[in-house]
Amino acid sequence: MTETLVAFDDVLASYDPAMGLEVHVELNTASKMFCGCPTEFGAEPNTQVCPTCLGLPGAMPVVNGKAVESAIRIGLALNCEIAEWCRFARKNYFYPDMPKNFQTSQYDEPICFEGYMDVDVDGETFRVEIERAHMEEDTGKSLHVGGATGRIHGADHSLVDYNRAGIPLIEIVTKPIVGAGAKAPEVARAYVAQLRDLIIALGVSDARMDQGSIRADVNLSLSPKDSGTLGTRTETKNVNSLRSVERAVRYEMSRHAGVLDAGRPILQETRHWHEDTGVTTSGREKSDAEDYRYFPEPDLVPVAPTRAWVEELRGTLPENPTQKRARLQAEWGFSDLEMRDTVGAGALLIVEETIAAGASPQAARKWWLGEMARRANEAGVEVGELGVTPVDVARVQVLVDEGKLNDKLARQVFDGLLAGEGSPDEIVAARGLAIVSDEGALSAAVDSAIAANPDVADKIRDGKVAAAGALIGAVMKEMRGQADAARVRELILEKLA
């Protein structure tokens, strides 16, 4: 059925949105949550498995202590309370990627609860309250062969890779986020971006959205404006980029309003996000907790972190996001607007790494929020997924600072980086992009431009130095952009003085 979408402004005139975000973070432990199998990404299918993570009879699980430590550190960084005693539970359901027919998770006794994170959107601070952060194991990965979409519907057959089954996860669940109004999509994106940066700073995960090591489920509902109630929610599963988080919230708000305006009820269901078309489609009816028949995991002992251990881990935390933003803004000399734009674009960490690699703060910001953001938008990916690294961008800027490139030539170097042609220096050499430093060649090009534009030359002789721009353009064209515009201007004014 074709969905009826309501214009975003019209949605806000009639409804209040409420969001809930569930973010799954794969921890970078060396072994899985309940067994000793390795967790290396990209291994051959079904080569990192054992009787425990395959759910074979008689195999007994053992809790990964490093995963518990990482969970506590995440909880502390999110201002959560840490449970003095918690235990695992079996979440029972059947699906091919869950070989045990249950997932070992936590239910009513999570390890972390009652936290918050403050996020900034356009100068306005929103407090996102954390309901819980609990430990669980990841599922396997299904591959549906055949069909137009790669989904199970219409597939010829399906394959399952159990390498991912049992990898430690932390699921971070927010309370309903209300009051964001028109900024709801941006708040959702900002929260996931800031959470991702925090996870990376903690060193507990690489938080690669493109590889699925951090994934977001977006819950959304609409209620009549100013009613103070919560509507029926839908859950959009496995949204795998910051851009998609924002787009999914915006789309679901428009879709919900279309359904409600038509007098139909919202179905409580899970939905699939399609990055290529920017729409969601129905998945399955959303289950409630009782449908999973949770009960305590009998094969695992409870987890009881001591207060001394928790306080020891608290001492390992990096500075919180608010403190870090204030410090970096002061160090970099960014205005409030420049800092908000950097944070809002999810580029704070990548700009920081580029500066650390040798670029100036303004140059790092210029490239990532300008050129790289434009290319990422055209490709439909995040800037961090382009394949250009902070070290690459810093090196390009160093070449600009040394007078070996200008901005136009630098963009051609980025073309080469995206095409996989090597390092910036290798691309400059292979493409012959370096700025011409031969004074004789520059002087000859200036003489040629003056001879070809006598009227412009006369204006400059009469003191109208602004006219030099036309001659500079002519020289740059002749030199194919491989000249220092400032030096060309100097030569023109010297010759016409």
Swiss-Prot record:
Molecular function in Gene Ontology: asparaginyl-tRNA synthase (glutamine-hydrolyzing) activity; ATP binding; glutaminyl-tRNA synthase (glutamine-hydrolyzing) activity
Xref: Gene3D superfamilies: 1.10.10.410
PROSITE patterns xrefs: GATB
Keyword ATP-binding: yes
UniProt keyword annotations, A-Z: ATP-binding, Ligase, Nucleotide-binding, Protein biosynthesis
EC number: 6.3.5.-
Enzyme class: ligase
Record-given protein name: Aspartyl/glutamyl-tRNA(Asn/Gln) amidotransferase subunit B
UniProt source species: Nocardioides sp. (strain ATCC BAA-499 / JS614)
Lineage: Bacteria, Bacillati, Actinomycetota, Actinomycetes, Propionibacteriales
Gene: gatB
